[in-house]
Structures are given as structure tokens and as C-alpha cells.
From Swiss-Prot:
The gene is yaaI. Belongs to the UPF0412 family. InterPro entries: UPF0412_YaaI (IPR020240). It holds the Pfam family DUF2541. The keyword Transmembrane does not apply. This is UPF0412 protein YaaI. Keywords: Signal. Residues 1-23 form the signal peptide. The keyword Signal applies. It comes from Escherichia coli O139:H28 (strain E24377A / ETEC).
Amino acid sequence: MKSVFTISASLAISLMLCCTAQANDHKILGVIAMPRNETNDLALKLPVCRIVKRIQLSADHGDLQLSGASVYFKAARSASQSLNIPSEIKEGQTTDWININSDNDNKRCVSKITFSGHTVNSSDMATLKIIGDD
């Protein structure tokens, strides 16, 4: 009886761990402090080049106004892609997923993501959190 309980408990724990790993492959790629004046050279450099198929943007602190974003891939010719992003993100809001077309088989990795924008409606700097999904 004790061995049946032990096996059942082990299976239950392994199923929970398995499903948890599969349910959330999202990773926080980084956080950028947004200045109060419009700036077009805000960059999030990824220390480890990683394959990212889509991203979400979140305003953790303060409201943001964005005027552009680009993704740079680690490739021989420094390929990049302009992203279609919302122009404004309010504090506490998270965008829908924004697809990144790295290539046909999604094998190129992202080395840097750049943003243009600034903080609005606040004397403090807003923070932009970038979440990736592979």
C-alpha cells in the first residue's frame, strides 16, 4: 500500500512539473527605463543570443509613448526588422503578442531590440518590460 501511494505521489509531482514547464515558456528579456524626453536610441542587448518568435511589452511603472521598435538578428549582414507596436502603453498594461519574423525556419537569434519613445504623464521615468516567447 505504501509503495502504491509513493508511486502515485511521484507521478502527480512529475506531471505538475512537466505541465508547468510547457505552460509558460515566456522569459523576461529585460527592462528599459524610459526617459522623459523623446529618445530614439534605447537598446536592450541580449547577452546570450536567443531565438525569440514573439514579444510582449509591459509598462511596469508609469505611462509610455512609443514611436518605433526594431529587432536585430545575429547574422552575417546584421539583418533587422521593424516592429508594429502600439503608440501608447499605460501603467500596468501589457500588449498583445508581437510576432517576430526571424526567418522561414525561425533559426536566427535576436541579439538586440531597440525602441524610440519616452515617459508621459509622470515626473519619474517609466519602465518598459520586454517579455519573449520562444
